[in-house]
Swiss-Prot record:
The gene is recA. It comes from Mesoplasma florum (strain ATCC 33453 / NBRC 100688 / NCTC 11704 / L1). GO terms for biological process: DNA recombination; DNA repair; SOS response. It is found in: Cytoplasm. Belongs to the RecA family. The keyword Membrane does not apply. Gene3D superfamilies: P-loop containing nucleotide triphosphate hydrolases. Keywords: ATP-binding, Cytoplasm, DNA damage, DNA recombination, DNA repair, DNA-binding, Nucleotide-binding, SOS response. HAMAP family: RecA (MF_00268). This is Protein RecA.
Length: 333
């Protein structure tokens, strides 16, 4: 294996490097040092369980992420939680609402600061993607959500007649946009989350008949592809109060793929983070459990999860400390 010292002894290579630097700048080609930080900067998903499934503690910065699934499965909720987490770190987030369906009241309830959220409601697909490109190139936005790919309708299709053929227009538009965007997204360290829907393939007799909209380009350029599916409903006093949601990482370029988890999304509350904290803190022995009794640092909390929830809500300093410990465990694992 060639060492770094041997690289600088190769005169032909040094000449090539100088030519590349002259034409394209110093950052066009680099050699990393032993002590350089190669860990991924991330934005938390807002769910400890999802952060753990992703494998690096959240959505990687400077990458494309696709969250897809059937309708009403929790896709937008996951994206809004990511926005809330970015804002907690003092970063700027944007929401490109191609569906024109963003519920600001719901976003506020799950922690989004709507007063500092940039929102665009474009009229057609090219406009949405141009806005996305401009925001990414500003190098000022940490997270951009596009909701959704299915709603990115090309201008030609919108202005044409209902009888006009428009096969492949959206796929070509997405392919061109992602080819242009991929490099600048990486350089700007912007995380771009595309929300996508599932469609039925026509005439499929064998295999999975479901596919995502927008062609194959998004599948190719995405670092993470996360599938979400609604599971059982949780009912209290005859009223549905929450849903179990299965989250599966079907593509992962930064950690081991195909990990999956089960989260709970409450109506008007979003991801039930406290339940996750109790589950994982018990798993990692941060919380001690003996039978039905829970304790923390030898302090008895009470019997059952409801007692722990109440205790955590009354002791925000202890909650913050447990969250910090959990993040350390997830990063190490």
């Amino acid at each position: 294996m060639s060492s770094k010292n041997e690289i600088w002894k190769n005169e032909a290579l040094i000449s090539a490097l100088k030519t590349i630097e002259k034409n394209y700048g110093k950052e066009a080609l680099v050699v990393y040092n032993e002590g350089d930080d190669i860990d991924h900067d991330v934005i938390s998903s807002g769910s400890f369980l999802i952060d753990q499934a992703i494998g690096i503690g959240g959505y990687p910065k400077g990458r494309v992420v696709e969250i897809f699934g059937p309708e009403s499965s929790g896709k937008t909720t996951l994206a809004l939680h990511a926005i809330a987490e970015a804002q907690k770190q003092g970063e700027i987030a944007a929401f490109i609402d191609a569906e024109h369906s963003l519920d600001l009241n719901y976003a506020k309830k799950i922690g989004v600061d709507i007063n500092s959220l940039l929102v665009s409601q474009p009229s057609y697909g090219e406009e949405a993607l141009d806005i996305l490109e401009t925001l990414v190139k500003s190098n000022s936005i940490s997270l951009i959500v596009v909701d959704s790919v299915a709603a990115l309708v090309p201008k030609t299709e919108l202005e044409g007649e209902m009888s006009d053929q428009s096969i492949g227009l959206q796929a070509r538009m997405m392919s061109k946009a992602l080819r242009k965007l991929n490099g600048v997204i990486s350089k700007s360290k912007t995380t771009v989350i595309f929300i996508n829907q599932l469609r039925e393939k026509i005439g499929i007799m064998f295999g999975n008949p479901e596919t995502t909209t927008g062609g194959r380009a998004l599948k190719f350029f995405s670092t993470l592809r996360i599938e979400v599916r609604k599971g059982e409903s949780l009912i209290e006093n005859g009223i549905v109060v929450a849903n179990k949601v299965k989250v599966k990482v079907v593509k992962n370029k930064v950690a081991v793929p195909f990990k999956q988890t089960l989260i709970t999304i409450g109506y008007d509350k979003g991801i039930e983070r406290i339940n996750e904290i109790i589950e994982l803190a018990t798993l990692y022995n941060i919380l001690d459990k003996s039978g039905v009794w829970y304790s923390y640092e030898k302090e008895k909390i009470g019997q059952g999860k409801n007692a722990v929830k109440e205790w955590l809500n009354k002791n925000p300093d202890k909650l913050s400390k447990i969250e910090f410990e959990l993040k350390e465990f997830i990063e190490k694992s």
